[in-house]
A protein has these predicted regions:
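RNase H-like, Mg2+-dependent phosphodiesterase core
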Residues: 1-219
């Protein structure tokens, strides 16, 4: 009798105004819970890096990335929830699970699970999808996916800052370092469409800063 393939899926980077969105899927394995992956948000960045390597060495892991430019293009016809559903379904298609645990990115977890299933290939419509709030705390396999996704995003932000050659903060709108960087960046550009591709131009934060800087914006 074959072992049930259980997969946890989570994302990192839905809300930032800078950088990519990452979604990770992790296949459950014996010994995962013993690694201490629960409540990943309380882990230090160094510990997350260590755990991500242990997880990626121990089991099947898939990570998909959607760049800021791709997010802007998709948002012309999709909501962020719909985009997230598509990426979660893509992970399912890569890992072929029997049961999936996901951190609900919708106010209605049942609807989120239904929409993911609907976006899966027809031969995967019968898989069990369990969507819950705080699944990254309640299920170690989702905690593991959260760790992997966050490590990939953090690494991407570090690489971007090194490439630009300046401090950009975390990329989140609530980070004063990120806002200061965006203000300096917007002063160097004549209109919104000339802003570098690593900035999510469709974000309200950018619209607001453009308006304050008296920049010409257009669709």
């Amino acid at each position: 009798m074959s072992m049930l393939r259980e997969v946890g899926i989570d994302e990192a980077g839905r809300g930032p105004v800078i950088g990519s969105l990452f979604v990770a899927g992790v296949l459950n394995f014996e010994g995962l819970e013993a690694l201490g992956v629960r409540d990943s948000k309380r882990l230090s960045p160094k510990r997350r890096e260590q755990l991500a390597k242990l997880i990626e060495d121990a089991t099947e892991v898939q990570v998909v990335e959607l760049t800021a430019r791709e997010i802007d293009e998709r948002r012309k016809s999709q909501t962020m929830n719909e985009i997230t559903v598509d990426l979660f379904a893509r992970i399912i298609g890569l890992l072929h699970p029997d049961r999936v645990y996901v951190d609900a990115a919708d106010v209605n977890p049942e609807r989120f699970a239904y929409n993911i299933r609907k976006r899966c290939n027809s031969n995967m419509h019968n898989i069990e999808i369990i969507a819950e709030f705080k699944a990254d705390v309640n299920y170690p396999v989702v905690s593991a996916a959260s760790i992997v996704a966050k490590v990939h995003r953090d690494r991407s932000i570090r690489e971007l800052a090194a490439e630009i050659g300046t401090e950009i903060g975390s990329g989140y709108p609530a980070d004063p370092r990120t806002i200061q960087f965006l203000k300096r960046l917007l002063n160097d550009h004549k209109d919104k469409n000339s802003i570098p591709a690593y900035v999510r131009r469709s974000w309200k934060t950018v619209e607001r800063l453009c308006h304050k800087a008296y920049l010409y914006t257009h669709d």
